[in-house]
Regions:
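SAM-dependent transferase fold signal centered on methyltransferase-like domains
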Residues: 1-448
């Protein structure tokens, strides 16, 4: 591969995402610390800073799997693939930010068709290597052939169509992050998993998933949407449903771990295991969201003729998170794992990083935002619950105004129910309280 980075090293500039140095192209602006929405593409292998929170959560989840052994047996390796890696920021963060004690168990592969992006990955990774040196022996693929690619400081780099890369080995961890819809890659992703594995899927075609583009939603996801306060949750559940039914076609079942609507994209993270019985039971977790009078909703497996116009789906109607795992995704854990200490920061500055104390504060704020509200909402999002958009509550309760969120949460909790904020760009309440209890709590707090 040609060393594209060396030829333009004076034109580009350094950035830090998490603990990891990223050499940006000269034609890409220095990112803002709180990006929202998709970045403007500046050429092959562009860095999308708005995806940084998703990459941070990926580091946290993979580190958690290694630390708590919920994916493979204690001491066993995890083979992880970023199937559409672009410039490889995610895999480089895996190597830089997952604790050194676990690095020897982590076998990382990165794949992309874009040669320029891979050049950028390998040269940057070689120039700014991780602290822990990893030199795994190469393993044959599932067809006992020698793999096609090169090893760079613990990252095996391949240049293939993602569907080929996914099918050539059995991975315990697969990240699928396309530019647009993941539909074209899902079958290969599921087939490329080992018997028990973890799959993370990103979709940036939110107009299709929410129903804002009904024709695209029907073509890609076979679903019908309603654009209202629940469109974000619908988008998450439509994508989760597609992953679940795709897995079922290959005699596999899913267990949701985390699922979020994060600005311009939807991302779902699931455990996948081979089970014919589990696959046969997938329809018990599929259904429709039917809007009710008064602004709330309920899930049904099959809407009747009177409900169809008020229904969106089909979608996943089961729990969306794993409580035990999600409640460990705290802000303190994120800073400990993904923010550099002063020694590392000085070493980064020594090689050219322009980074001020204000940059550090902004970066910490961004890292905290990546997981904000997740631990608090973990219990409710892992079982049956109801969502309420805070802006809808005044009309529902007839109060003309909404109470402060924390005050409403406290009121609901005093009655023995759970209440938390959902990590969404909009202010959502998640609770297990009955609808009439929620409205009574709104009225009580609005009288104070």
């Amino acid at each position: 591969m040609a060393d594209d980075l060396s030829s333009v090293e004076n034109a580009g500039h350094l950035w830090m995402e998490g603990k990891t140095l990223v050499h940006l192209r000269g034609d890409q602006d220095r990112p803002t610390h709180m990006p929202r929405g998709p970045a403007k593409r500046t050429g092959p292998g562009f860095l999308n800073p708005a995806m940084a929170p998703a990459r941070t959560r990926s580091v946290l989840l993979l580190a958690d799997a290694l630390e708590h052994d919920w994916l493979v047996k204690p001491g066993h390796d995890i083979r992880a693939l970023d199937a559409l890696c672009a410039t490889g920021v995610r895999v480089r963060r895996w190597r830089n930010e997952i604790p050194a004690v676990h690095q020897g168990r982590l076998r990382v592969s990165a794949n992309d068709l874009d040669e320029t992006a891979l050049n950028w990955l390998t040269t940057t990774h070689d120039r700014y290597p991780p602290d822990t040196e990893i030199d795994h022996a190469l393993e044959d693929d599932r067809y006992t052939r020698a793999p096609s690619g090169t090893m760079h400081n613990g990252v095996f780099v391949m240049q293939n169509d993602a569907r080929i890369a996914l099918m050539e080995a059995a991975y315990q961890w697969v990240d699928l992050d396309p530019f647009g819809s993941p539909v074209n890659f899902l079958d290969a992703a599921v087939q490329g998993l080992s018997r028990v594995a973890f799959l993370e899927v990103t979709a940036t075609d939110t107009a299709a998933l929410t129903g804002s583009s009904p024709s695209s939603q029907q073509r890609r996801y076979g679903a019908k949407g309603i654009v209202d306060s629940y469109a974000h949750d619908d988008a998450v559940r439509v994508l989760m449903g597609l992953v679940a039914t795709t897995a079922a076609r290959h005699d596999r079942c899913i267990e949701p771990v985390l699922a979020l609507f994060d600005g311009h994209h939807v991302r779902v993270s699931v455990k996948v295991r081979r089970s014919r019985d589990g696959a046969s039971d997938v329809l018990s977790s599929m259904g429709w969201r039917v809007r009710e009078q008064g602004g709330t909703y309920r899930f049904v497996h099959h809407p009747d003729s009177e409900q169809v116009e008020r229904a969106s789906g089909p979608m996943w109607i089961g729990p969306l998170w794993d409580k035990t795992i999600a409640e460990r995704l705290t802000e303190d854990r994120t800073i400990d794992l993904c923010f550099p200490d002063e020694d590392r920061l000085e070493r980064h500055r020594d090689v050219g990083l322009d980074w001020s104390s204000d940059d550090s504060e902004y970066a910490k704020r961004e890292l905290r935002r990546s997981v904000r509200y997740i631990a608090d909402a973990a219990d409710l999002m892992s079982r049956n619950h109801t969502l309420y958009h805070m802006d809808d509550l005044p009309n529902m309760a007839g109060t003309g105004q909404a109470p402060k969120m924390e005050a409403l949460f406290d009121e609901i909790r005093t009655l023995g129910y759970g209440a938390a904020r959902v990590p969404d760009i909009d202010p959502f309440l998640v609770t297990d309280a009955p609808h009439d209890v929620v409205l009574q709590c709104v009225r009580e707090r609005c009288q104070d």
